[in-house]
Amino acid sequence: MPAYGLTYRFRFPVALRRRRRSRFSGGSLYARRRRRRVRVKGGFLPALIPLGAALISAIPGIASVAMQASQLKK
């Protein structure tokens, strides 16, 4: 079979936008840490909503395992 029908595709990362160097490009770790910190919006309650949904969806599975374990002991 001839090899001319084979196509290779390569992906190369390309920098589309260059960042300007900041004033704190030296050894100032405090400025870097402060800049990376992102405040979580919404507070504590929106973080609990996915956990509550996961618990509600897991209840039938937990109950079935408990029922099977109790039936095996009899």
Curated annotation (Swiss-Prot):
Its main location: virion. Residues 1-27, 44-74 form a propeptide. GO terms for molecular function: DNA binding. It is found in: Virion. This is Late L2 mu core protein. InterPro entries: Adenovirus_late_L2_mu_core. GO terms for cellular component: viral nucleocapsid. Keywords: DNA-binding, Late protein, Virion. The record marks G27, S28, G43, F44 as: Cleavage. It comes from Murine adenovirus A serotype 1.
